[in-house]
Amino acid sequence: MAAPSAPTAEDWAFAGSYTNKNSKGYRYNWGQQVRSMMGTVVEGPDQGYVRFRIEIAPDGTLAKLETIWTTSAVAEQLARKAVENMPPLPPTPTGKPLIFEKTISFTPFASDGPPSYKDDCLPDPPVFRNPFAWDGKSPQVRSEPPKAEKLDPQAMEDCLRQLPRDSIEAEMARDRREMERWGWNK
């Protein structure tokens, strides 16, 4: 399978200004840029995945690249070479270091599509805590689940202003991920 195309200048301009969800657009474009520079992949022993922990300095330069795991030494080598030869990136959207993990797929089938941004302005749901958990010593007290925080109207308006229009490709990728996750396609 041929390598996907690299993000365009327009894609990077959007990614350089999108601050929601830990700079989701920047992280996606970074992965696309790396994969596009890795070249064509054919089915065989060299295909695989590699997961990195990445730190990008506020000016867009790579500060740290650490391999978390890999299924192919060739895929890791190609990904590292691509990272070393990346063109200059725009500054991070927040003006702070951007730290994230990314899995690069060097396989003959597409496994990563564009992200969907439509729910990015909704507050994150509260973390589930078992209300019946008990340490066996203290008195048993049922804890109330935390309430979801509401975004103030001004923050919601600012967030909605940043959202791009969702593309058909993003919706198809989201649907494909859901199908693979829940086994709808079997």
Positions of predicted regions on the chain:
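Short proline/glycine- and basic residue-enriched helix-capping loop/turn segments at helix->loop/beta transitions
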Residues: N20-F52, R80-K118, L122
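Short tight loops/turns at secondary-structure junctions
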Residues: P45-T71, V83
